């Protein structure tokens, strides 16, 4: 029987095994391969597993070990999914598709289930195409996105936002890392902002994707007007979307969450990201579409 698993550190509290079991009714095994030595974990994959998911801090290490890549994975330069094939180890990035699906659901509730039922394993492609076109109608001017954090998840978020048609700014604790991404992907015309400009950038942008694992102090400085946005009454547009990767210990919580709601912004939990990257990624392992409703029960 084919075996699957997750590489990362720490991962002892990961929901991935439960999601995988729910998605396939226990048909396949899914193990946690935890440890700080990526080489040792990768050797375990080579010896015993058909496919693995990869989480922090190893997404860029995984990318470098692959023999070939899907198109967006190659562009992003990080992988959260490795699969053995007759042609070698394939790297994919279901963070990218998970982000696309999460944002699609935020702007158009119900679209994921509808498209999954209609298009099966190609649903994420159809969702991407449909939402990219639809967003041009939802906004009366070019929408703007801010991606905070430029690790593996941040790279995927930046490409996803740009692919959906957002003018995208990158922000990182070290601006040089953000600039490196911008230089590597000139086709997206990424802007690099300083972390000191976080509050002003949140107010200006329509979409904020926060991928840092920790909370920056400026989050607590955000007020209702920042979440409403600077052009709230000038241009018709959807509510501001705050999308956070960290579902275990979110940075947007407590009083700032109350101000977010008062400003009519929409918060999207990292649970959605986890769910939809699993949905679009697991099919690459098995060739079978997992049970989305059963996976939702895990969340």
Residue spans for each PLM region:
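Glycine-rich adenosine-cofactor-binding loop
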Residues: 8, 91-96, 103, 107, ...
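Short glycine-/small-residue-rich Rossmann-like dinucleotide-binding loops
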Residues: 57, 210-214, 246-247
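Rossmann-fold NAD(P) dinucleotide-binding segment
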Residues: 61, 216-243, 255
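NAD(P)-binding Rossmann-fold cofactor-contacting core
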Residues: 166-185
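Rossmann-like NAD(P)-binding element
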Residues: 174, 198-226, 235
């Amino acid at each position: 029987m084919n075996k699957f698993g997750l590489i990362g550190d720490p991962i002892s509290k990961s929901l991935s095994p439960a999601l995988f079991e729910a998605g396939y009714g226990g048909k396949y095994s899914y193990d946690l391969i935890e440890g700080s030595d990526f080489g040792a974990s990768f050797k375990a994959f080579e010896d015993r597993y058909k496919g693995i998911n990869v989480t922090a801090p190893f997404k860029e290490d995984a990318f470098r070990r692959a023999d070939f890549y899907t198109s967006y994975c190659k562009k992003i330069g990080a992988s959260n999914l490795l699969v053995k094939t007759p042609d070698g180890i394939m790297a994919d990035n279901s963070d990218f598709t998970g982000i696309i699906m999460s944002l699609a659901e935020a702007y158009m509730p119900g679209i994921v289930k509808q498209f999954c039922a209609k298009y099966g394993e190609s649903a994420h492609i159809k969702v991407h195409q449909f939402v990219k076109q639809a967003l041009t109608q939802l906004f009366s001017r070019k929408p703007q996105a801010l991606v905070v954090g430029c690790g593996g998840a941040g790279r995927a978020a930046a490409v996803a936002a740009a692919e959906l048609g957002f003018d995208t700014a990158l922000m990182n604790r070290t601006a040089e890392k953000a600039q490196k991404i911008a230089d590597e992907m000139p086709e997206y015309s990424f802007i690099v902002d300083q972390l000191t400009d976080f509050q002003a950038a949140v107010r200006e942008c329509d979409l904020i994707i926060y991928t840092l694992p920790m909370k920056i102090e400026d989050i607590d400085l955000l007020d209702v007007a920042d979440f409403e946005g600077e052009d709230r009454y000038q241009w018709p547009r959807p509510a501001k979307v705050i999308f956070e990767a960290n579902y275990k210990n979110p940075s947007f919580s407590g009083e700032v969450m109350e101000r977010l709601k008062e400003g009519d912004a929409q918060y999207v939990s990292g649970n959605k990201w986890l769910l939809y990257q699993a949905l679009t990624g697991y099919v690459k392992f098995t060739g079978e579409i997992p049970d989305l409703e059963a996976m939702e029960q895990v969340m």
